[in-house]
């Protein structure tokens, strides 16, 4: 399944607040579609599917990528759902978004892809790059990169950076202090339902 490039507010009307997808708020609160205003009792499968879709659309990843992350999470000691969220949260594009250097994860992905971002003083152009504690993230020292990021910094963003990131706004650098705690994940969802959705697929 390819990455979604359609109307973002249509997705948030169906799935709820997805901070990584858009900060805009839909004026219409009913679900999209001809029968969107009709309240239907959700099935257990439907509930789990919806939680999975929240994860995909918020982080901007494909079905194949999500399945790979779940396989990876299952191979790490600990609670699989929490580890899955930590893997997604420690992606470079997500950290750039959480720092407020981009208004959405999609915008952060472009910053990384266009080589505006450095990790430990080395340009990294892979949005899915898995950051580690001790890594130092920075904006390239050129006028174009800094101008673009400063414009983004003026846009509304999440209220505060999570505690595992130490951000120097003046110098546009940040240090990764550790792995994100579950409580600092901005997306509201039940990750256990996501793991249950894939239980027979992986």
Swiss-Prot record:
Classification via Pfam families: Ribosomal_S4 (PF00163), S4 (PF01479)
Q: Where is the S4 RNA-binding domain?
A: 90-152
Domain of life from the UniProt record? Eukaryota
PANTHER family linked? 30S 40S RIBOSOMAL PROTEIN, SMALL RIBOSOMAL SUBUNIT PROTEIN US4M
Family, according to the entry, reads as follows:
Belongs to the universal ribosomal protein uS4 family.
What subunit structure does UniProt give?
Part of the 30S ribosomal subunit. Contacts protein S5. The interaction surface between S4 and S5 is involved in control of translational fidelity.
Q: What is this protein called?
A: Small ribosomal subunit protein uS4c
* Species assigned in the record: Emiliania huxleyi
């Amino acid at each position: 399944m390819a990455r979604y490039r359609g109307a973002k507010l249509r997705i948030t009307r169906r799935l709820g607040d997805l901070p990584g997808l858009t900060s805009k708020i839909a004026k219409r609160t009913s679900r999209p579609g001809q029968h969107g205003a009709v309240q239907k009792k959700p099935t257990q499968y439907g509930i789990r599917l919806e939680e999975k879709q929240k994860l995909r659309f918020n982080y901007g990843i494909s079905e194949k990528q999500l399945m790979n992350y779940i396989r990876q999470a299952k191979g790490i000691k600990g609670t699989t759902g929490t580890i899955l969220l930590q893997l997604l949260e420690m992606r470079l594009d997500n950290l750039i978004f959480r720092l407020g250097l981009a208004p959405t994860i999609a915008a952060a992905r472009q910053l990384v892809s266009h080589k505006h971002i450095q990790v430990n003083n080395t340009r990294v152009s892979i949005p899915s790059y898995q950051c580690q504690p001790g890594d130092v993230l920075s904006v390239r020292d050129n006028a174009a990169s800094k101008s673009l990021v400063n414009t983004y910094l003026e846009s509304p963003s999440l209220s505060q950076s999570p505690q595992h990131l130490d951000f120097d706004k003046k110098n546009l650098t940040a240090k990764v202090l550790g792995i994100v705690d579950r409580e600092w994940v901005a997306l509201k969802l039940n990750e256990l339902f996501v793991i249950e959705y894939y239980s027979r697929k992986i």
